[in-house]
Design a protein with these regions (language model features):
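Transmembrane alpha-helices and adjacent helix-loop boundaries
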Residues: 110-117
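Interhelical loop and adjacent transmembrane-helix boundary motif
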Residues: 15, 59, 217-271
Length: 283
């Protein structure tokens, strides 16, 4: 009776002027995202297939692919390991200066990439604080692929830490206590109780660090040495083609990077959806 006398009103939209905000959203996506990317794709149509294939498979370009993706993968693996350790320490331990350490984790986010590259070069070059100690032993960390990996580790670590940290904070301590009461060792508790919970977040952080490293330019060019076929990254190849007025070739290589970045974005979104299902978090 009450339901028939007072029919339920449709819920009001959270945002006032929904159609107006939707229009602004579509306009933003069109002007800032879709139109520039569409222009990139259409620019490649000026090339024949042979020209496109020659541009994206030249010896220097292939060498830059190997360095860019290989160094990004290695850096992401290192960040996955040390990012987990840093997140674990920040969540599970209290110590003097913890807030300072927690703030320093985000430093690569705020620091201009050029400043990061110059700082790493000054530190690791042959006349740097660390470089001059290692160079007599035949260890060179700057102006070669090692420098590329180090720069990518520096800029990618926060992605893993900030992805794993909230999952560790929300982990149920009761499960760990129950495992301990049942006779599990600390290692067994970590591998069978804690690790399965944080694996989705760890994979997401790995993918985000990898995606960030693939497109990195500013911090790498200062420490890489930029030697063709040795320490030349793909973004530098694109810049070089633009400086030589080879716009079609630069567009072709950029399209390859765009397709790969889009695939990475799909993988990251899939991992995040898996993480939400795994942890029971709302979508």
């Amino acid at each position: 009776m009450t339901a028939s006398l007072f029919p339920r009103r449709p819920p009001k939209r959270v945002l006032p002027g929904f159609h107006l905000t939707l229009g602004y959203t579509i306009l933003y996506l069109s002007l800032i995202v879709l139109i520039p990317l569409s222009a990139l794709v259409f620019k490649t149509f000026t090339l024949t297939w042979d020209q496109f294939w020659s541009a994206v498979t030249g010896p220097r370009v292939l060498a830059s692919y190997r360095l860019t993706f290989g160094a990004s993968f290695i850096a992401a693996l290192v960040n996955a390991f040390f990012g987990l350790l840093v997140a674990w320490v920040l969540v599970r331990y209290d110590f003097f200066g913890k807030k300072v350490v927690d703030a320093l984790v985000d430093l690569p986010f705020a620091l201009p990439t050029a400043v990061a590259g110059i700082s790493l070069t000054a530190l690791l070059a042959g006349n740097g604080w660390i470089g001059q100690l290692l160079e007599p032993h035949g260890i060179q960390l700057a102006f070669n692929p090692n420098g590329v990996v180090i720069a990518l580790i520096f800029i990618g670590l926060p992605f893993v830490v900030r992805t794993v940290q909230p999952v560790l904070e929300d982990a149920e301590k009761e499960l760990e206590e129950a495992a301990t009461c049942l006779g599990a060792t600390r290692w067994q508790t970590f591998t069978r109780v804690i690790l399965p919970t944080i694996v989705p977040a760890l994979l997401t952080g790995f993918a985000m660090a990898f995606a960030r490293a693939v497109g990195e330019y500013g911090s790498v060019i200062f420490i890489a040495g930029n030697m063709p076929m040795v320490s030349e990254i793909t973004p530098l190849i694109i810049i070089g083609k633009l400086e030589q007025y080879d716009y079609a070739g630069a567009t072709a290589v950029a399209l390859v990077m765009l397709v790969f970045s889009f695939i990475l974005l799909l993988i990251i979104n899939a991992l995040q959806a898996w993480q939400r299902r795994h942890t029971g978090a709302p979508a």
